[in-house]
Amino acid sequence: MDTSVPVISSDYIHSARTEYKLTNDESPITLQFPSTLERTRVRIMGKCMKVDHVVIEYRNQVPFNAQGSVIVTIRDTRLSDEQQDQAQFTFPIGCNVDLHYFSASYFSIDDNVPWQLLYKVEDSNVKNGITFAQIKAKLKLSAAKHSTDIKFKQPTIKILSKDYGPDCVDFWSVGKPKPIRRLIQNEPGTDYDTGPKYRPITVQPGETWATKSTIGRYTSMRYTRPNPIDIDDSSSKQYTSEAEFPLRGLHQLPEASLDPGDSISQTQSMSKKDIESIIEQTVNKCLIAHRGSSHKDL
């Protein structure tokens, strides 16, 4: 992988045009990267690198009536095995094409170069092991002090054979996942646990406050919330206990124990004379009680 082409330039790093044998299994395509000396120079400068542009030149060496599809895949080995594919191209085995891929991510000089180019042939009438094409890869790199957002540019295919058109080729590029916010859940007892001590109670339709109230639940504790409790208490025992939900049976008390009595509109009205009589009796009882306590002190 030695080359005299500097990393920070507008030139491409060319790999040798190499003949490749037909195979149904994924096999690597040679992609020339900067020499160890050149990468060390960029590392000393304290910069990171980015693959700006990859060009894969495919030139077939098959009979006129050869059939089959060539599949070229670009991978980033920094990801898990099932998510490494970044782009993929498919085209007929007899079609001469130039494949263009534009990167959208940076990588560190301290790590191994993460990019891989792979090819395979499917549904072909050409025998396995036969040399079927020459492939040459060109790579353009750039260096930066730090990474920045890169505008996505879709991969393209340039068809060079007159017998083939856009309907004969296809390409795909990986999509960017939707960002998801991860909420912070502190462990109980930490110094930075300054939030409310108890979770707010949310009463859903068909539930009561008594069935949802709990004790001893900290906001920062990670636990699986129990399923909503049935009003008839048919399934609550398998999720809760009396210690966790001490008020869950409150809604089952008889109505008489919760009855505050008749409202003022349901009681008989009292006259002024009745009120004066009640006050007079109360005052007399207080005076008699006071006189009795005074005689005892003497």
From Swiss-Prot:
It comes from the Viruses. It is a peripheral membrane protein. It is found in: Host cell membrane; Host microsome membrane; Host endoplasmic reticulum membrane. One of its GO terms (molecular function) is DNA binding. Coiled coil: none annotated. It holds the Pfam family Gemini_BL1. The keyword Lipid metabolism does not apply. GO terms for cellular component: host cell endoplasmic reticulum membrane; host cell plasma membrane; membrane. Keywords: DNA-binding, Host cell membrane, Host endoplasmic reticulum, Host membrane, Host microsome, Membrane, Phosphoprotein, Transport, Viral movement protein. GO terms for biological process: transport of virus in host, cell to cell. Phosphorylated. Belongs to the begomovirus movement protein BC1 family. Transports viral genome to neighboring plant cells directly through plasmosdesmata, without any budding. The movement protein allows efficient cell to cell propagation, by bypassing the host cell wall barrier. Begomovirus genome is shuttled out of nucleus by Nuclear shuttle protein (NSP) and the movement protein transports the DNA-NSP complex to cell plasmodesmata and facilitates further movement across the cell wall. Binds to dimeric supercoiled plasmid DNA. This is Movement protein BC1.
